[in-house]
């Protein structure tokens, strides 16, 4: 009888877990739809900025005539790389499957790779999971940003990237790389590594005899465009990461709900079997008692 009570207690516990994970799945699904729409809209704008800046980068020396202009430094890769700044995004919350693992594994591998080349790598962490992971590993973080990955904010994104750009222009770092797990579709996330600084022309069709004309005067537009390019790439990465996070959490909670359902089914079978055995045992005892009285 005690065995039946124990099984019944387990069924109730797993069933409650099933209801919780199913509710979390529904919440993530609703949040995903909103985040997915925001990511798709932002992606179009980010791609267009990339295309324009890539086109300009081909003829940058024609636009900026002063070789000492700081804007040129943002396009020219240094011959010797001594320091690299790595900005990476993870989730502030858990229960999202392997979403954070891809990013953390990639960052850890990059750390080893650069250290093997005697290149100093500085980490700028966005998201509680990544911050706690590297704190546990006793790896120093240059910057820590909490609550930004779960609530993307344009002004805060600007703050993050402006600090990195300033360090590049001041000679404190030679390259800035952005790593995040991005949204591909409702069931797939895609790890993205973006070499933000210096600006690298994207793989689009371009020629040195470009017909692109800049209005207003080239250098004025270039300054605003570069600023927008850095800011929006940072902001888009946050939005893209959040959509991927909701997608991963929706899948994780769906899997957890299905596993809980399967476990409840197993426990119900075990309960029915134990109950049947208990009834059979009682019947045998009754029959045996009657036989002994004859």
Swiss-Prot record:
Pfam family membership, one: ATP-synt
Localization of this protein: Cell inner membrane
One annotated GO molecular function: proton-transporting ATP synthase activity, rotational mechanism
A GO CC annotation given for this chain: proton-transporting ATP synthase complex
Disulphide bond pairs: none
Membrane-topology descriptor: Peripheral membrane protein
Keywords annotated in UniProt: ATP synthesis, Cell inner membrane, Cell membrane, CF(1), Hydrogen ion transport, Ion transport, Membrane, Transport
GO terms under biological process: proton motive force-driven plasma membrane ATP synthesis
Protein role: Produces ATP from ADP in the presence of a proton gradient across the membrane. The gamma chain is believed to be important in regulating ATPase activity and the flow of protons through the CF(0) complex.
Family indicated by similarity: Belongs to the ATPase gamma chain family.
Subunit comment: F-type ATPases have 2 components, CF(1) - the catalytic core - and CF(0) - the membrane proton channel. CF(1) has five subunits: alpha(3), beta(3), gamma(1), delta(1), epsilon(1). CF(0) has three main subunits: a, b and c.
Name of this protein: ATP synthase gamma chain
Source organism of the structure: Campylobacter jejuni subsp. jejuni serotype O:23/36 (strain 81-176)
């Amino acid at each position: 009888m005690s065995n039946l009570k124990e099984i019944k207690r387990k069924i109730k516990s797993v069933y409650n877990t099933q209801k919780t994970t199913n509710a979390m799945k529904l919440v993530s699904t609703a949040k995903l739809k909103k985040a997915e729409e925001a990511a798709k809209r932002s992606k179009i704008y980010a791609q267009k900025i990339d295309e324009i800046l890539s086109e300009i980068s081909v003829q940058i020396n024609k636009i900026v005539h002063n070789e000492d202009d700081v804007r040129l430094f943002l396009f020219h890769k240094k011959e010797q790389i001594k320091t690299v700044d790595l900005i990476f995004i993870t989730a502030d919350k858990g229960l999202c499957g392997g979403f954070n693992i891809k990013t953390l594994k990639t960052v850890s591998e990059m750390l080893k790779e650069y250290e093997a080349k005697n290149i100093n790598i500085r980490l700028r962490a966005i998201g509680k999971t990544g911050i706690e992971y590297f704190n546990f590993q006793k790896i120093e973080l240059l910057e820590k940003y909490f609550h930004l990955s779960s609530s993307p904010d344009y002004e805060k994104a600007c703050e993050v990237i402006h600090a990195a750009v300033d360090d590049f222009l001041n000679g404190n770092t030679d390259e800035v790389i952005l790593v995040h797990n991005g949204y591909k579709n409702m069931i797939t996330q895609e790890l993205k590594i973006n070499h933000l600084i210096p600006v690298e022309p994207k793989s689009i069709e371009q020629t040195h005899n470009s017909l692109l004309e800049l209005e207003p005067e080239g250098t004025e537009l270039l300054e605003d465009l570069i600023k927008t390019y850095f800011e929006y790439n940072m902001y888009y990465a946050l939005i893209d990461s959040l959509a991927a996070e909701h997608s991963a959490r929706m899948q994780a909670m769906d899997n957890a709900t299905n596993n809980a359902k399967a476990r409840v089914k197993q426990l119900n079978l075990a309960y029915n079997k134990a109950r049947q055995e208990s009834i059979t045992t009682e019947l045998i005892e009754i029959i045996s008692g009657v036989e002994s009285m004859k």
